[in-house]
Amino acid sequence: MSGSVSRDAEALKSADSSTRRSGGRITFPFMIVTLFGLTLATLGWLQNLIVYLIEEYNMKSIAAAKILNIFSGFTFMFPAIGAIAADSFFGTIPVILVSSFISLVGVVLLALTTLFDSLRPQACETASKLCQAPTNIQLGVLYTAITLGCVGAGGLRFTLATAGANQYEKTKDQGSFFNWFFFTWYLAASISATAIVYAEENISWSFGFGLCVAANLLGLIVFISGKKFYKHDKPLGSPFTSLLRVIFAAIRKRKAVVSTNEKDYHSESKKTPTKSFRFFNRAALKQDDEVNSDGTIHNQWRLCSVQQVEDFKAVIRIIPLVLAILFLSTPIAMQLGLTVLQGLVMDRRLGPHFKIPAGSLQVITLLSTCLFIIVNDRFLYPFYQKLTGKFPTPIQRVGIGHVFNILSMAVTAIVEAKRLKIVQKGHFLGSSSVADMSVLWLFPPLVIVGIGEAFHFPGNVALCYQEFPESMRSTATSITSVLIGICFYTSTALIDLIQKTTAWLPDDINHGRVDNVYWILVIGGVLNLGYFLVCSWFYKYRNLENADHEQDANVSH
């Protein structure tokens, strides 16, 4: 898989990234162990948060699912802030160090809520109407802990990938690190969703969260231990600044006449701006006293280069395609929470002595994604290339991901309809509200959504790296992450809307129609796929001339 990410890894490389000779392979174990520990710590509590809120804070199931979506969205959106802070002000190493410490404080505070009874409401039977609600102080401590944990995790997630790749000079070595980065992330995610979640539910919450504290502390100590070996990159300024300059400069010159003469534009390559979005060509239009005698720009907020204008146009062109990610990931975000709720009211026994934790169900998706990323890179894509002579484009891969996503929601709807029929017939396990239906029925849709993610997530990241301006490639991954984060908020808003307009999502889903919710997602997915196909039909690749040489630039996640 090393060759499949070479171009994307090179996008992470920063020119003149070090003021001294350092970095190299000696930094590899420090970076990887840091990633493993911090990922294990964060996902160890985040993946089982719904169950913790229901069992220990007496929250209703739907409310707990919405809280998970809110904080998961925050975790995905914060990497953009971390990336901007690293690029513009501090560099990657300090941002990772501070983020790791913030994450540790959050996890420690969360662990304290399991040790002190005063930080939790009085325990009662789950789903009882007499349960005591948490006080404002208890919620304040809880939300502070979760927020700190999310800020820390978000600040280091993709910044650590950039810092790790910047330790190497050769593109091949950077590609190798990038592969190990994503492999380690998925490995840690799988372990946290199984071992740590199992410890939380079968030993104690304090023991499980204690493991998260230990993992975070290990990651922080290892990262500090390797600090003297790291290559420290220089802050190069925010890549978004030049985009804002184009807007301001074009508005200031809105009355100027657009010229077709290349001499009227500020360009180092002696070219004129393209005809599309001609209004913004004014930003590169030279006027009196805007260029100094040495060729430099007097005021960068009044005059931009042609390249800056074209970079801005590239962002505008790709926005419609990228927006399709919003509804592509929204059903996945909803499925993430609803699947846990479904698992809680299904037979999770696997043999006489083992019970699958509801919070561990998502590991099926993680493992499915891991497996099919390898299948795609090693078998499917090369086979397609032999048949057609071309490698699948990022847009084609994203389109396939759309189809699998829709299929997963449809299968989940069918499974839930079957479960509700069993509930209506009164087939429960003993006197509980758990339907006499194995949770293994949820495995097929979770596998299918994982297959879809193996197509669309790497495809979206590859599309951003290829088509976003070169100055933005180091933060392209965080942009994708922000959109996924927004999806968690849109999923929460959609749940609110469904609750207000229907009776499909009561706190006890045995009396609801979660299957109808999934069918709504299927309809929305089909409409979104149609929108995506229309956008892709009109879209022209910015770097099409290099496609034949870089078709194997498939980002693995």
From Swiss-Prot:
Cellular localization per UniProt: Membrane
Membrane-spanning parts: 26-46, 67-87, 89-109, 136-156, 177-197, 203-223, 318-338, 356-376, 398-418, 439-459, 478-498, 518-538
Tissue expression pattern: Expressed in roots.
Any one GO molecular-function label of the UniProt entry: transmembrane transporter activity
Keyword Nuclease annotated: no
Membrane topology value: Multi-pass membrane protein
GO biological process: nitrate assimilation
Database matches in Pfam families: PTR2
Main location per the UniProt record: membrane
UniProt keyword list: Membrane, Nitrate assimilation, Transmembrane, Transmembrane helix, Transport
A single Gene Ontology CC term: membrane
Function recorded in the entry: Transporter involved in a passive nitrate efflux.
Family membership: Belongs to the major facilitator superfamily. Proton-dependent oligopeptide transporter (POT/PTR) (TC 2.A.17) family.
Protein name: Protein NRT1/ PTR FAMILY 2.6
Organism: Arabidopsis thaliana (Mouse-ear cress)
Gene responsible for this protein: NPF2.6
